[in-house]
Amino acid sequence: MWEREKRFMISGDHILARITPNICLWDYDNDYLAIYLRNLRKVKTMQLGTLLTAHRQVITEVDARIDELIAHHARRLDEICGILEGGDATVWQLAHAMHWDFGTGEFAKFPPSQRWFALLEVFAHAAIFLQVVCLISTRHHWVVQ
């Protein structure tokens, strides 16, 4: 819900204050991460003063938070590209090699539900590389081109 005159929005899970929304790959026909990033940029043009999230936080520095989310995803993409420079890897292997700000930070120690979210996020980040021709998808691996 957006109140243009009051510069107010209820964002649901689209923009969260303390964590990043879990952007997943649900099919290969859509680039969900690119869509999400495009939508963040669109929200930034709305010049919001207050944003209510689905996790009970109020965000008053909306543009700054959007910039943080965009930067987070850029770092993730750089991290995956750096890992893949060492050779091909499955999404599972990528997830194990990545830095995580959850629990101990070790993917292997995540509870099953958190591993599931992490893997779907890695899939979404790896899939965006298909758009920039950094990776190709083989049957079992993402490979740097």
Task: Identify the function of each model-found stretch.
Residues 82-145:
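C-terminal regulatory/interaction regions
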Residues 1-77:
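Metallo-beta-lactamase
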